[in-house]
């Protein structure tokens, strides 16, 4: 209910004329046709009440501007009728000695920066007003703003962080995105009233919100969204909103600092360029040479990074496929023809040997290579002939039509995926922001996958990407109770080649920050996952949307050439059945668990061993063939797989065959 324009007692006699001026302006606006909107009435009431209660004389507009609740909108309304009015509406600035040469600039209209918290709150409040809401309460507005994905930072407090002052004394610990509300109310863009507080956008706020939308090139998504066709991704590299990733690095400037991480983008196969993709730390960087095309804005890029996790666990044994794993498991036996050839493939066993210092630039250069593609998923040499491994698995091609004419790419989120109180809005938010279909299903593994749905037959094919999303707090608990290793093992065995591990939140304020950082490092470097890092929910939503566009672009580009030469994607039913079958414990699974108890035997090494020898009996039989040559027995596994180092090979031999 709008407050009544009634006269109040003025604390200072000198301010009676000013108070009367505000009151008369209020009454005159109420008498206009259509009256005065409730939120504007609250704004004028607050201004009038605080003018009446002022303890200092108000002699100019500058003095009036200092009164709490009086923003630029109120100043503009009173400018023509205020006694002794001044054209300068800006807050008074210091005129201390030494400020010579400064120009007395006029007032500058406040417009929030793009993707700032104020920007997101103002646009959200504007959209909700259009949808019929006259006001919003604090938590309701925070939830709606975070669900919009318009802010680069969280609006409400991050529950994964400790209380301010627990780990650092910086005043930044107290800041959240909601802190900008003070600025919005003081500038007259948002009106606040009642207890509990209710927030309403003013007319000035509406015009500012529209200006923000216009400057950002955004449509107003307040109206219902209708999608009639799949997105046009012919030039997606230039159209997508960029993903901004951060590494978890502590610096002297504060508990956490956002720095660069390896960034790659989907490459155009016709463009042969090799830019360097850097991984920056506080003082140094690792330069990855890969066949990728960077985005136009070097600070932000679309990321589908060079995961070394493309092995396909199919064929003879569900853990490791005989064909797809040959380059990494047993090149001397299964791929001897290529054993002496230098390629651009990234084999993570070669990682330590391929880093060379470049002292002149203070950086390190890594010769990147991967059995499967890195950024454009096709990093084999042009001379290498490999029907199945050159590109990712493709849906079947039944006509001469292009990919988007035959198929629709759909993002599938697990129904157990937890986004807190925002879960109900997550699907609509991704759908409205990125114009991509999103559905909820019960996934047997992972938190998100992408399917290609046949537009005529409605058959669903699972594309070669899967995401496991972890909040830093959940990641810490999963490490403690060993769910962490089991979940990663299930991801590796699911048959999809691009494994994305999405870590949400900042671990630095936590006691277990070092454990989380180590887990992220080993997951990416040693185990070949593509580890994506996001500061919070809003960035996670953008990551899902941008990955969907990038995946769509990749399949659109390679469908015409790769559909006849690559493997065929699993149908959704085949994928779920395969994952359900993996839950069954086999003799090889038990053998792998036993091997991982041996010193120096990693998960990758254990998988490599059982790929060669699925049971303990088969391994013992292989040792028996070399009986009498202890040196050869100790090196047998090392010679058959680059994933097994000399120490692990020797220790496994001692466990299985050596006496004593």
UniProtKB/Swiss-Prot annotation:
Its main location: nucleus. Induction: By DNA-damaging treatments such as high intensity light, UV-C and gamma-radiation. GO terms for molecular function: 3'-flap endonuclease activity; crossover junction DNA endonuclease activity; DNA binding; metal ion binding. Its EC number is 3.1.22.-. Pfam families: ERCC4 (PF02732), MUS81-like_WH (PF21136). Residues 82-98 have a biased composition (Low complexity). GO terms for cellular component: Holliday junction resolvase complex; nucleus. Residues 411-506 form the ERCC4 domain. CDD domains: WH_MUS81, XPF_nuclease_Mus81. A motif (Helix-hairpin-helix motif 2) lies at residues 586-623. Interacts with EME1 to form a DNA structure-specific endonuclease with substrate preference for branched DNA structures with a 5'-end at the branch nick. Typical substrates include 3'-flap structures, D-loops, replication forks, nicked Holliday junctions and also intact Holliday junctions with a reduced efficiency. May be required in mitosis for the processing of stalled or collapsed replication fork intermediates. Plays a role in DNA repair and in genotoxic stress-induced homologous recombination (HR) in somatic cells. Forms a heterodimer with EME1. Interacts with RAD54. This is Crossover junction endonuclease MUS81. It comes from Oryza sativa subsp. japonica (Rice).
């Amino acid at each position: 209910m709008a407050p009544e324009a009634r006269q109040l007692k003025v604390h200072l006699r000198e301010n009676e004329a000013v108070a009367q001026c505000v009151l008369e302006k209020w009454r005159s606006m109420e008498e206009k046709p259509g009256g005065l909107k409730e939120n504007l009435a609250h704004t004028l009431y607050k201004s009038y009440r605080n003018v009446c209660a002022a303890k200092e004389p108000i002699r100019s507009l500058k003095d009036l501007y200092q009164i709490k609740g009086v923003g630029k909108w109120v100043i503009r309304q009173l400018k023509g009728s205020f006694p002794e009015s001044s054209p300068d509406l800006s807050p008074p600035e210091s005129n201390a000695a030494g400020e010579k040469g400064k120009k007395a600039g006029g007032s500058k209209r406040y417009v929030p920066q793009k993707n700032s918290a104020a920007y997101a709150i103002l646009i959200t409040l504007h959209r909700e007003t259009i949808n019929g809401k006259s006001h919003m309460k604090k938590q309701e507005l925070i939830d709606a703003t975070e669900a919009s994905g318009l802010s680069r930072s969280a609006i409400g407090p991050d529950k994964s962080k400790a209380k301010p002052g627990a780990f650092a004394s910086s005043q930044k610990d107290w800041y959240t995105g909601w802190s900008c509300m003070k600025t919005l109310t003081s500038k007259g863009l948002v009106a606040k009233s009642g207890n509990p507080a209710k927030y309403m956008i003013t007319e000035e706020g509406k015009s500012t919100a529209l200006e923000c939308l216009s400057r950002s090139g955004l449509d107003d998504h307040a109206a219902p969204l209708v999608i009639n066709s799949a997105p046009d991704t012919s030039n997606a590299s230039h159209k997508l909103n960029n993903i901004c990733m951060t590494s978890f690095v502590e610096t002297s400037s504060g508990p956490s600092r956002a720095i660069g991480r390896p960034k790659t983008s989907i490459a155009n196969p016709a463009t042969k360029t090799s830019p360097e993709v850097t991984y920056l730390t506080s003082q140094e960087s690792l330069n990855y040479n890969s066949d990728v095309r960077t985005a136009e804005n070097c600070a932000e890029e679309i990321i589908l990074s060079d995961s070394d996790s493309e092995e396909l666990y199919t064929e003879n044994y569900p853990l490791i496929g005989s064909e797809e794993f040959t380059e990494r498991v047993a090149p001397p036996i299964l791929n001897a023809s290529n054993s002496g050839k230098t390629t651009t493939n990234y084999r993570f066993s070669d990682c330590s040997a391929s880093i060379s210092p470049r002292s002149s630039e203070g950086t390190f250069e890594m010769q990147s290579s991967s059995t499967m593609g890195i950024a454009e998923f096709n990093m084999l040499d042009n001379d290498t002939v490999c029907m199945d491994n050159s590109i990712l698995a493709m849906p079947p091609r039944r006509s001469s039509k292009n990919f988007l004419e035959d198929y629709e790419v759909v993002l599938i989120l697990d129904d157990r995926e937890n986004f807190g109180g925002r879960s109900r809005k997550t699907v609509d938010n991704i759908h409205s922001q990125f114009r991509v279909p999103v559905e909820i299903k019960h996934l047997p593994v992972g938190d998100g996958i992408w399917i290609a749905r046949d537009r005529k037959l409605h058959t669903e094919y699972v594309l070669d990407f899967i995401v496991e999303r972890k909040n830093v707090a959940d990641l810490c608990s999963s490490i403690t109770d060993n769910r962490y290793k089991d979940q990663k093992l299930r991801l590796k065995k699911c048959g999809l080649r691009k494994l994305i591990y999405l870590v949400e939140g900042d671990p630095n304020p936590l006691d277990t920050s070092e454990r989380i950082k180590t887990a992220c490092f080993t997951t990416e470097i040693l185990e070949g996952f593509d580890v994506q890092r996001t500061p919070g929910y809003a960035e996670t939503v953008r990551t899902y949307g941008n990955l969907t566009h990038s995946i769509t672009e990749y399949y659109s580009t390679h469908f015409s050439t790769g559909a006849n030469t690559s493997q065929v994607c699993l149908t959704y039913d085949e994928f779920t059945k395969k994952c359900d079958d993996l839950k069954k414990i086999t003799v090889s699974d038990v053998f792998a668990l036993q091997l991982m108890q041996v010193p120096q035997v990693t998960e990758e090494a254990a998988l490599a061993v059982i790929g060669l020898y699925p049971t303990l009996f088969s391994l013992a039989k292989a040792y028996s063939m070399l009986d009498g040559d202890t040196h050869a027995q100790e090196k047998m596994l090392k010679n058959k797989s680059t994933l097994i180092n000399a120490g692990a090979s020797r220790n496994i031999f001692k466990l299985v065959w050596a006496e004593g």
